[in-house]
Structures are given as C-alpha cells and as structure tokens.
Amino acid sequence: MTKKSIIISIISVICLVGIAAFVMYGCSGGKENEEKSGASGQITVISREEGSGTRDAFVEVMGITDEKGNDITADMAELTNSTSVMMSTVKGNKNAIGYVSLGSLSSDVKAVKLDGVAPSTATVKDGSYKLQRPFKIAYINAKLTDIDKDFISFIMSKQGEAVIAKEGYISTEAKEDYTGSGKKGTITIAGSTSVAPVMNVLADEYKKLNPDVKIEIQESGSSAGIESAMQGAVEIAMSSRELKEDEAKTLKSQTIALDGIAVIVNSSNTLDALTSEQVKNIFAGNVSAWEEVTK
C-alpha cells in the first residue's frame, strides 16, 4: 500500500468515527431533550362532559370561552362523565391532560403547577391558586322535610365542617354545634360527581348519629342534579359550580366548601408546570403537540 493510500484510509476512518459520534450524540441528545420536555407527540385532551359543574367552572376560570361566554373546548377532546373516569383515562395515556377536583386527586396522576403555584388546600384558601370553585347544595326550601333540614344543619355545623376539612376541602366558618340525634326517614340527593365523595362521608357521619336515616346519593353531574331538585325528583342537589340565574330563581343554595381544580397529566410526564395561557390554548385546540408547549 502506498503512503498516499494509507493517508486516505486514515482520513476515511476518522470521518466515519466522527459521523458515528455525531449520530450517537444527536440521538442521545434528542432523547435527553425529550425527557426534559416531559412528553412528545400529539396532546390527548381529556375533558368532562357538558353539564359537568367541574367543566363549567374550569372553562370559566381559565377563559376557554368566546366573546359571548360560550364554552370553546376543542371538538377533538375526549369526554369523560365522572372524576374517577377522568383520572383513569389520564393514568392510561402518557400524552393525556385533564382536570379533576383537588379533593379527589390521587397519586395515579400528576398535578402540575399553574402559573407557578401548586394546587393545595393552603393555596386555595389563601387565593394564590386561582383555579377554584365552590361546592354547593341547592334545594326548594318549601319542599324540605324536617329530616332534610336536619341533615343540612349537620353539614353546616362544626361537626360537618370538621368532616369537610378532613377530606381535604376548605370548609365554611361554622358557628354552631350539631345537637340532633335519633332521626328517622329518607333523604334523596343528586348531582356533582366531584361533591359526591365528601357528601358520602358526611352522610356516613350523620348516620352514625341517626342510624335510622337512609340517604340516597346519585352521581349525575351538577346540571342534572340541579334539574332533578327543580323538578322535585330529589330533595337536595349537589353542585360544583354557582347556580345560573334561572336556577337561582327556583332553588336556594348554600356553599358547603371551596375546592381547587387540579390540571393533571400522566405520571410519566416530567412536565411540572403550565401557564394559564398554555392551558387555555391546549383545551381550546390551539396547541396540539407537546413540543409546542415545551419549546
């Protein structure tokens, strides 16, 4: 082999090594960037169904509405009909994003910071976490039975307040103790799937003091529960939003707690925070890929 051939061979080897190193670096670097970004590919938007109080509060606070106040959640969003289905759907899809009641949040999914603030009981209470809404009960006052009124007095008492706080919600400032016991009868309640978990606990605690009372709780969504109360199908409605003007003409309402709404992603997503504007654009369908969020 001539000296010239040897030199050419050496140069060729050096070039091949350089190209290989560049390719390996590019691949590993791309992977590293993907890991830092938290997710890649198409965003799967998960929303609650129309009529959900959680959805109504979410789109109102986040501004996912047009100039007339109409909900503009993206048509391509997958719809779920309860808090539990929302969490299981996000848990099963690494590119998913959704939202749930803070009080129902579990370790199966990951809550992200909103505008730099993590959702918590403390940040909801001090107002620094802005994505929050009331939990309400609503009813036709004239149609309440004595047992209905007694249960409501328990909810609004210091004992009821303690139950609500223990379940991770912001309770109202109750001033009176509940002194009833030994009641009998049946109470029918329907509405929000977000309010239902704490309402079930309240019902259980009430029945410890009144074992002969039967409380039936139907999880049908805020709007459906309100409609049922207006029609007289149930005595008490549960709502995770404020009553609309026409609803408030028929029903009296009381706030029993404040709750945050957590924006959630899959646990494998390393994304930790979003701005309100990013959340709005994702759910309105203006942003469709995770790379657009993290670039």
Where are the predicted features?
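Exported/periplasmic ABC-transporter solute-binding proteins
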Residues: 4-295
